[in-house]
Amino acid sequence: MTIRVFMVDDHALVRAGMRMILSGETDIEVVGEAESGEAALPLIRKLRPDVVLCDLHLPGVSGLEVTERVVRGKHARVIVVSVLEDGPMPRKLIEAGASGYVGKGGDSTELLRAVRDVARGKRYLAAGIAQKLALSGLDGSQSPFDELSPRELEIAMLLVQGLRQEDIARKLSLSPKTVNTHKSRLFAKLGIEDNIALARLASQYGLLDPALVL
């Protein structure tokens, strides 16, 4: 049985690299790709792939939101491919329904194993990520962002990137009032009062790629 894969990444070179790796396998077929969450979601609904490889940091709708929507609609299983291997994001993506999480620094063997395992209904975490998740539970170390819901965490990410509440509401198809409620709750949970404090905390705990923090 051929595993049908759809790729979502805003970098054409990354998509080309993954396509080259996947296309060399007789049991895997790349059925489509997109450079944004907005473009990907209707194509995923139409093409019905078995596995979606999704970047975390996408323009507009984030990888977290893509994961939630794809899983909620039962359109495919999702593997998140990200440069972030530390901080709360791997755990949050798994909580949001992702079936796998691999780092962009991994090799082709790891990517292929992730695709095959997830297509068979298993969960796959890159070894380094799985170890960090296990150790974070064993040594009692916690990030304040662990207390946030997946939606609150996504809104925190967008706030750190400099988006206004109105922009976030439009991107996530939420009302401005709902976004404001989530913002108030996440600020209270984190013990902060403004976006500057949020950006500092996010950078400290690995919530975002430091290059994205204003």
Language model feature labels by segment:
Residues 36-39, 62-65, 85:
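Acidic catalytic/metal-coordinating carboxylates
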Residues 164-197:
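Recognition helix of helix-turn-helix DNA-binding domains
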Residues 14, 59, 86:
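The feature encodes the CheY-like receiver
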Residues 50, 56-57:
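The short loop immediately C-terminal to the conserved phospho-acceptor aspartate in CheY-like receiver
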Residues 55, 82:
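Active-site residues of response regulator receiver
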Residues 42, 64-75:
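Short amphipathic alpha-helix used as the core "switch/output" element in two-component signaling
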Residues 88-95, 99-156, 196, 204-210:
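Short, flexible helix-to-coil linker/hinge segments that flank and couple to helix-turn-helix
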Residues 33-51:
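Acidic, metal-coordinating helix/loop segments flanking the phosphotransfer/catalytic sites
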